Amino acid sequence: MPSFFLKQKTLIYIVIFSYFLTGCTLNKALFNGNNLNGWIPYGTEKWYVENGELICESGPNAQYGYLKTKKNYKNFILELEFKQEANGNSGVFIRSTVDGTKVSGWQVEVAPPRKFTGGIYESYGRGWLIKPNPAKDSALKMGEWNYMKIKVIGSSITTWLNGTKMIHFTDKKIGAGEGGIALQIHDGGGIKVRWRNIYIKEL
């Protein structure tokens, strides 16, 4: 085979390999740092952008509030950072659905110390499904930026907080779930949580 065709064939292989390599490592930003494009707020609590950060804050009604993606996500790796101010009781919902202003689904807890951050809670259902070992509570840095990773595949959820594996849980009901990703602010008032660097990789 002439060298010209060998070079062309090699170039094609390089392009194809690069395409698949990029596709396997590409993460999509769910928050653009400028506005709430791609998200829908539910409830009367405050959701706004400040200095490139997404902020949720208790509103006048001090009720539950949610910010949900317009798109649904089934199997994925979600990575984000959060910083709790004041109470800091919040959460990240996966495969969540909406009924009026009520968001149901499975919540990865984001809460003050000794309140099981990284555990899984089923809202409007069975309640706590799994809580992290209390010895792992030290992974939470209250008042500082925390890195959370959530992996959802089929019926299984695994969570990490600042590099510490918090839980791994498998459940048929979760496996059958369909819906979007939602951030939550707890009721009760006096809550403020900052979010940034929210990225997803669909699997």
Residue ranges: model-predicted function:
Residues 2-12:
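Bacterial N-terminal signal peptides that target proteins for export
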Residues 8-9, 21, 35:
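Prokaryotic Sec-type signal peptides and long signal-anchor helices
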Residues 13-22:
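Bacterial N-terminal signal peptides
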Residues 24-203:
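Carbohydrate-interacting regions of secretory-pathway proteins
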